[in-house]
Amino acid sequence: PFWAAVATQAGRLLRLQGTVPATQVQRRIMEQYGERETVSRRARYVLRSFLDWGVLRESGSKGIYSQGDVVAVEDLRLIAWLAEAALYVRPGGSGPLKELMAGPSFFPFRFAPIRADSISDASSRLDVFRLGLDEDLLMLRKKNRNE
């Protein structure tokens, strides 16, 4: 969950202002996890990993990062796996498919268009429920949630 929280804050900042100031990410993470030096340090380590992987880039100013490489994800099994990982950090283990796949924590990825039923076909650990004409709810299968 910690990595997802840092990725979410970085993705939100990229959408809002186009840059990711490390101090803002650290402050927001400390609001969630407590004002301890270890929280701030670990957030910095996660950001450094994002830099090492190329999904964030150094900008001209120290401690301010910009969008790096965006990875196109077309493999349905990989999309299902990433969706499942995102569900594990959500309370209740469920969420609307569109919201989930467009979430800020997935800022390094561009997903191929997918249908909800194809995700459940790609993973035996996910269920899909239709909520309306154009709304699908993705959930972790019950037997999986306590493992």
Model regions and ranges:
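Short, amphipathic alpha-helical interaction segments positioned at domain boundaries
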Residues: 2-3, 70-97, 147
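Long, low-complexity, charge-rich intrinsically disordered regions
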Residues: 140-147
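A short, conserved structural fragment
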Residues: 51-61, 123-133
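Short amphipathic alpha-helical interaction segments
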Residues: 36-49, 108-122
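Short helix-coil junctions and helix-kink-helix linkers
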Residues: 27-38, 98-114
